[in-house]
Amino acid sequence: MLQVSVYRYNPDQDAAPFMQEFQVDTGGKDIMVLDVLALIKEQDEGFSYRRSCREGVCGSDGMNINGKNGLACITPLSAVVKGNKLVVRPLPGLPVIRDLVVDMSIFYKQYEKVQPFLQNDTPAPAIERKQSPEEREKLDGLYECILCACCSTSCPSFWWNPDKFLGPAALLQAYRFLADSRDNKTEERLAALDDPFSVFRCRSIMNCVSVCPKGLNPTKAIGHIRQMLLQSGT
């Protein structure tokens, strides 16, 4: 039997959060953490968590698993369990709605600030705006983000200033459009990032890199933005 400790909090009935212990029979199999949560829900139907695709694509089930953020659906027990103990908590730094469900509003608000869509005020071509293979290659490692928030909620700078520091996920997407040859709003995008908090509160500790389920490198992208800001003189 696997010993599982999960964070519980129902604001309608709990005065404060608490950790609840469960014994889960995994059948001796190396199942995913999400499967363990489903077995817990069979024991307690009121247990709440987010999940959707079960394939590491939607980003819904980001949570803190034995002290490290990750996606429950693609995290096998063998990768995290030590001493037959599993501890699951909500993503840190965000308000808890119930149990493992967090309020993502500030995360999406910061993402929205970078205007994550192509902007080009030149006349649109009849078919599409073309890119060379080399130009397209510059977007690799940027567009694959699934907005699971594992990176931003592992970042102390985001914990301390969630309303000012944009966070790794938003800044990765900021650079994704700065690097896109089809976008011609570089000057405006950089001007919007020109303040002491939006970009420069990153301390390059690379927590974001260590937890990204897609193997992306927000710290590197933030470094590129810093360089562009310095070179532009803004």
Task: Annotate the PLM regions.
Residues 68-88:
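Glycine-rich phosphate/adenylate-binding loop and adjacent beta-alpha elements
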Residues 25, 64-68:
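Short strand-turn-strand beta-turns centered on an Asx-Gly dipeptide
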Residues 44-50:
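Active-site phosphate-binding and catalytic loops of NTP-dependent enzymes
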Residues 20-31:
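Short, contiguous acidic and Ser/Thr-rich linear segments
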Residues 11-16:
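Short N-terminal binding/cap micro-motifs at the start of the first secondary-structure element
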Residues 1-4:
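Short structural boundary motif marking the start of a folded domain
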Residues 31-43, 87-234:
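Ferredoxin-type iron-sulfur electron-transfer modules in oxidoreductases and energy-metabolism complexes
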Residues 53-62:
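Short, structured protein-protein interaction patches enriched in aromatics and acidic/basic residues
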